Amino acid sequence: LGAIGMYRYKFKGKAIIDGLLYIPVVIPEIVLGISLLTIFAKVNIPRGMLTLILAHVTFCIPFVIFNVRARLAGYDSSIEEASMDLGANRLVTFFEVTLPVLAPGILGGALLAFTLSIDDVIISYFVYGQTKTYPLKVMESVKSGVAPDVNALSTLILVGTILFVLLTQGDLFKKKVRQ
């Protein structure tokens, strides 16, 4: 929804919000991690799962918004108007017309955000508290030898990723053959 709002509407402060979206993308992760840690300390939020989630959302949301906004760039909004002319209300139009068109951008952004999040060590290190994330566990185990559970989880993630890529590429191939 943020991407739709930023793409379609003009409002006061839009340029500022757009500029703020680029900050987590362009600043070094260590600076972002220290900044978030400082903010959480100032507002007395104890480090833990909440700070970890807030930090990762802060870090990853721009990638989702940029992906969806790129999808919107080639979107013809006249199909929404046609939907409403045929009797659909705004909510039905959103779920039946807009969302299916934006779904690849949303999915791509979500996968990119997941990949960045699961790979992130630096920000997680600063904000994690008692919660051990997968990358932190891997970094910790490298010092003493990689534990079997880390190897197993890494293998599952790799196999899952390969299967996902093969399935999506197969689906794309089938669509091209049909055309």
Language-model features: locations:
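Generic alpha-helical transmembrane segments of integral inner-membrane proteins
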Residues: L1, I27, I106, A110, ...
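Membrane-embedded alpha-helices of multi-pass transport/permease systems
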Residues: L1, I34, R47, T51-L54, ...
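Transmembrane-helix boundary motif in ABC transporter permease subunits
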Residues: L1-L21, T38, L167-K176
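C-terminal transmembrane helix and the adjacent membrane-cytosol boundary/short C-terminal tail
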Residues: G13, R69-E80, M84, R90-L99, ...
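Membrane-interfacial helix termini and adjacent extracytoplasmic/periplasmic loops
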Residues: G13-A15, I30-F59, L91, Y128-G129
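Residue-level signature of the transmembrane alpha-helical core
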Residues: I16-I23, L50-V57, T98, I106, ...
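Transmembrane alpha-helices
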Residues: I27, V64-R69, Y75-S77, A88-D119
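Interhelical loop and adjacent transmembrane-helix boundary motif
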Residues: I118-Q169
